Amino acid sequence: MLRFLNQCSQGRGAWLLMAFTALALELTALWFQHVMLLKPCVLCIYERCALFGVLGAALIGAIAPKTPLRYVAMVIWLYSAFRGVQLTYEHTMLQLYPSPFATCDFMVRFPEWLPLDKWVPQVFVASGDCAERQWDFLGMEMPQWLLGIFIAYLIVAVLVVISQPFKAKKRDLFGR
């Protein structure tokens, strides 16, 4: 299995599949926001940023999968998936155990050199409350679904990193 994951990490297909899944999730979030009129909270926006990190890592990996640049993509992938797990866990706890003392920020805080909320307000401005339950599917809220998704991204990322020393076996039918 590790040899297979190593081989997949050196091809564009797996990276493009990851980019497709992350892009599909981002488009779904925008659909929830602009079509279903659900208000994203601050943690939702941060989770969206973590998902953009996974998307960016996938695109970097797809650009040059056989070069050392794929290791940069793996680091970004690991970091983004880990931060996504942290953020969605915090968000899930806020929704499952609401408290007037445990709240999220009132507005998104981006660095001054990257004010995404001012550049693309349709995507990065938060207007909802983190503790409010707006949507559920099969008995789970949106942060709980995202927690499972980010855990899956993280597990696969760890396995791909572990698989890097395991090179694919050369198949030689004639024993040359």
Curated annotation (Swiss-Prot):
<keyword id="KW-1133">Transmembrane helix</keyword>
<protein>
    <recommendedName>
        <fullName>Disulfide bond formation protein B</fullName>
    </recommendedName>
</protein>
<dbReference type="GO" id="GO:0005886">
    <property type="term" value="C:plasma membrane"/>
</dbReference>
<dbReference type="InterPro" id="IPR050183">
    <property type="entry name" value="DsbB"/>
</dbReference>
<dbReference type="Pfam" id="PF02600">
    <property type="entry name" value="DsbB"/>
</dbReference>
<keyword id="KW-0676">Redox-active center</keyword>
<keyword id="KW-0997">Cell inner membrane</keyword>
<keyword id="KW-1003">Cell membrane</keyword>
<dbReference type="InterPro" id="IPR003752">
    <property type="entry name" value="DiS_bond_form_DsbB/BdbC"/>
</dbReference>
<comment type="similarity">
    <text>Belongs to the DsbB family.</text>
</comment>
<dbReference type="InterPro" id="IPR022920">
    <property type="entry name" value="Disulphide_bond_form_DsbB"/>
</dbReference>
<feature type="topological domain" description="Periplasmic">
    <location>
        <begin position="32"/>
        <end position="49"/>
    </location>
</feature>
<feature type="transmembrane region" description="Helical">
    <location>
        <begin position="15"/>
        <end position="31"/>
    </location>
</feature>
<dbReference type="GO" id="GO:0009055">
    <property type="term" value="F:electron transfer activity"/>
</dbReference>
<dbReference type="GO" id="GO:0006457">
    <property type="term" value="P:protein folding"/>
</dbReference>
<feature type="disulfide bond" description="Redox-active">
    <location>
        <begin position="41"/>
        <end position="44"/>
    </location>
</feature>
<feature type="transmembrane region" description="Helical">
    <location>
        <begin position="72"/>
        <end position="89"/>
    </location>
</feature>
<keyword id="KW-0143">Chaperone</keyword>
<feature type="transmembrane region" description="Helical">
    <location>
        <begin position="50"/>
        <end position="65"/>
    </location>
</feature>
<keyword id="KW-0472">Membrane</keyword>
<keyword id="KW-0813">Transport</keyword>
<feature type="topological domain" description="Periplasmic">
    <location>
        <begin position="90"/>
        <end position="144"/>
    </location>
</feature>
<feature type="topological domain" description="Cytoplasmic">
    <location>
        <begin position="1"/>
        <end position="14"/>
    </location>
</feature>
<keyword id="KW-0812">Transmembrane</keyword>
<feature type="topological domain" description="Cytoplasmic">
    <location>
        <begin position="164"/>
        <end position="176"/>
    </location>
</feature>
<feature type="disulfide bond" description="Redox-active">
    <location>
        <begin position="104"/>
        <end position="130"/>
    </location>
</feature>
<feature type="topological domain" description="Cytoplasmic">
    <location>
        <begin position="66"/>
        <end position="71"/>
    </location>
</feature>
<comment type="function">
    <text>Required for disulfide bond formation in some periplasmic proteins such as PhoA or OmpA. Acts by oxidizing the DsbA protein.</text>
</comment>
<dbReference type="InterPro" id="IPR023380">
    <property type="entry name" value="DsbB-like_sf"/>
</dbReference>
<keyword id="KW-0249">Electron transport</keyword>
<feature type="transmembrane region" description="Helical">
    <location>
        <begin position="145"/>
        <end position="163"/>
    </location>
</feature>
<dbReference type="GO" id="GO:0015035">
    <property type="term" value="F:protein-disulfide reductase activity"/>
</dbReference>
<keyword id="KW-0560">Oxidoreductase</keyword>
<keyword id="KW-1015">Disulfide bond</keyword>
